């Protein structure tokens, strides 16, 4: 088992928005090929896992079938004006029963939990690059070898809370996503429990509220920018949301280094 501890190193960005953003971009561009592999694996696995789980959870399969029926009717009608789009939106909303909402929360939580170790991998690769250490393809899967159970638990709990929050009110879900933003690096680098990662992330995020909020918003905007390029661009911009986590974490907590247990 590898552990990590905190030290102050020159590679650690200052607790300033510009410094952290520059640090994140440097890591992102330096690990781009690994990030591209990561996002392909992540998105494929996410849609496969989430799709399969939705059919096995009560209410999920019926909703998927209803969505497919509504979308087929929309395409066959060949009416793409504002009224048709509004009608489509209303039909999809009508199909979202309470059972469907619960099934989505469960399926997305399980999917995110299973993929959380992969997210840790891209965070760890950012660390390796930043520390001028050799990066290997196997580093992408380190989350499946170290503190895996707690990483998975963290992924499940936080996603369940975020998804439930989004169902209640979008602002609640967004706030929870923001509050949990650096919890995963904490669980991994500090080899701690999921609950401790949640607690410490809340504490540190609120202690550095404005800085983290601005960076969280910018990371989200940059990661979503690929949608403007026929969706394909998401493959190139999506990983930035995850590499930014390491930069924010290292600015607040100090850059970790590997030690023997």
Q: Where in this protein do the model-derived segments appear?
A:
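Interfacial aromatic "cap" segments that immediately flank transmembrane helices
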Residues: 14-45, 137-164, 178-227
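Alpha-helical transmembrane segments and their immediate juxtamembrane interface regions
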Residues: 71-86, 186, 190-211, 250-261
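Selective recognition of hydrophobic, aromatic-rich stretches within alpha-helical transmembrane segments
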Residues: 2-4, 97-131, 159-195, 223, ...
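Short, charged helix-to-loop "capping" segments that act as catalytic/coupling loops
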Residues: 11, 147, 168-170
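Short, small/hydrophobic-residue-rich motifs at membrane-helix boundaries and re-entrant hairpins
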Residues: 14-127, 131, 150
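Alpha-helix boundary/capping detector
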Residues: 47-54, 62, 66, 148, ...
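Low-complexity, intrinsically disordered extramembrane tails and loops of integral membrane proteins
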Residues: 1-23, 255-261
């Amino acid at each position: 088992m590898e552990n990590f501890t905190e030290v102050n190193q020159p590679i650690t960005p200052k607790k300033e928005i510009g410094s952290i953003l520059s640090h994140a971009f440097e890591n992102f561009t330096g690990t781009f090929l690994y990030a591209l592999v990561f996002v392909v694996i992540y998105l494929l696995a996410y849609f496969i896992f989430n799709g399969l789980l939705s059919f096995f959870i009560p209410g999920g399969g019926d909703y998927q079938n209803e969505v497919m029926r509504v979308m087929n009717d929309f395409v066959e009608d060949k009416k793409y004006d504002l009224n048709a789009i509004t009608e489509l939106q209303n039909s999809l909303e009508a199909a979202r029963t309470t059972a469907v909402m619960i099934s989505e929360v469960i399926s997305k939580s399980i999917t995110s939990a299973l993929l959380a170790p992969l997210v840790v991998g891209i965070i760890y690769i950012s660390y390796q690059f930043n520390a001028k250490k050799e990066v290997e393809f196997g580093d992408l899967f380190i989350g499946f070898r170290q503190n895996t159970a707690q990483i998975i638990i963290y992924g499940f709990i936080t996603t369940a809370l975020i998804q439930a929050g989004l169902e209640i009110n979008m602002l609640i879900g967004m706030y929870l996503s923001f509050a949990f933003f650096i919890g995963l690096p904490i669980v991994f680098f500090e080899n701690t429990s999921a609950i401790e990662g949640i607690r410490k992330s809340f504490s540190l995020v609120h202690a550095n509220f404005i800085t983290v909020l601005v960076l969280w918003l910018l990371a989200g905007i940059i990661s979503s920018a690929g949608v403007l390029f026929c969706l394909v661009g998401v493959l190139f911009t999506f990983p930035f949301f995850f590499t930014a986590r390491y930069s924010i974490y290292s600015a607040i907590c100090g850059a970790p280094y590997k030690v023997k247990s």
